[in-house]
């Protein structure tokens, strides 16, 4: 094997209702890199370019949702940044969404990706140089266009 890929996504727990963003967290990556892990081969680095909704019921994980439209104010009410209370029972992506459920919207924020990229550059060997954006499609790419 000539090189590896350090996947810098899904860094947090989808199961913990206190998690702010399980896709990418600077604090999670920082703690991992502090452990001084070595791989013995050059690494490329993969960063997330996607978002999802984490469906919680009574504080317990139920599902990952990929296509949630929170603009429907009859179904959803934002209770805090990125957290939406379900107001109406409905089905979404073959999941029964119940009134009172909470959906946590998690995104790959450009500034967080850049912070993590700078952290990785300061901690890892200089022979590691390639950047990979994971799950890149036209919808996800549009969030990174200026």
Regions found by a protein language model. Name each.
Residues 1-70:
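Substrate-binding surface in catalytic domains of secreted glycosidases
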Residues 44, 50-52, 57-146:
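Substrate-binding cleft of secreted/luminal carbohydrate-active enzymes
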């Amino acid at each position: 094997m000539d090189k590896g890929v350090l996947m810098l996504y899904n860094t947090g727990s989808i199961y913990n209702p206190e998690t702010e963003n399980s896709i990418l967290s600077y604090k999670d990556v920082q703690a991992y890199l502090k452990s001084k892990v070595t791989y013995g081969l050059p690494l490329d680095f993969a960063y997330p370019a996607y978002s999802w909704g984490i469906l919680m019921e009574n504080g317990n994980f139920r599902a990952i949702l990929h296509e949630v439209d929170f603009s429907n104010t009859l179904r959803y009410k934002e209770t805090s940044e990125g957290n939406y209370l379900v107001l109406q029972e409905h089905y979404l992506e073959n999941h029964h969404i119940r009134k009172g459920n909470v959906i946590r919207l998690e995104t790959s924020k450009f500034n967080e990706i850049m912070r993590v990229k700078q952290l990785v550059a300061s901690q890892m060997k200089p022979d590691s140089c390639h950047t990979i954006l994971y799950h890149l499609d036209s919808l996800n790419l549009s969030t990174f266009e200026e």
